[in-house]
Amino acid sequence: MVLIAALAALAACGGGDEETTSTTTSAESADTESTTTADASGCSEVEEVEVLAFAQHKDQEFVAADYETNPPAGGDHNPEPLQGGNFYAEPPRLGEAVHLLEHGAVIGWTNDLAPEEQEAIEEAFNEVFQEGYYQLAAVENPELEVPFALSAWGALQTCESAAPEAIAPFVEEWYASPKSSESALACDGTARRLPPC
């Protein structure tokens, strides 16, 4: 079941609530920062992930272990991006989803949500879509270690339950992420209405 919705990444469009920052180091020695941008129950602070502004195109099947975070927030990916503006009930190629992130998108990742939880996530994405954020996607990901997560190029937020209230603040902060060299594609005029990127 594929539904139109559209999710993408908005950091260039800016603005944020109170922020607290701390630096940590992952097992793979990548620096990350945690930034509070959403007050969603059951969700982590937004983690800023150190990524290159661009990555390599590789024609291979990617799995969660190929990336520093799960779900991915950047890295090498397939040559073709995932089609934004959709809900994917079946997992698409992970490398195509990561390529969409490079284009400034925000992706909501789900793992076996109850039908009413999935519907709430889709409704929240549709509300953001109606505000002009068209590079969005919701993707089923059985490799996800939590029920719900949001990612953009260089940013990740994980949730211990479905958290539709976390979507709008994350999109407002990370749509068209300034951490990607290709994020302007989220604001390139192909949509009918665009956020102020």
Tell where the protein language model's regions lie, with residue ranges:
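N-terminal export and membrane-targeting signals
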Residues: 1-3
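Surface-exposed, low-hydrophobicity interaction/linker segments
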Residues: 37-98, 118
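C-terminal motif of bacterial Sec signal peptides marking the signal peptidase cleavage site
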Residues: 8-12
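Mid-length scaffold segments of soluble, non-membrane domains
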Residues: 88-132
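Extracellular mucin-like PTS domains
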Residues: 19-38
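Helix-rich interaction surfaces within compact, conserved domain-sized segments
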Residues: 127-197
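Pocket-edge structural micro-motifs
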Residues: 69-71, 110, 140, 152
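Bacterial signal peptide processing site
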Residues: 13-17
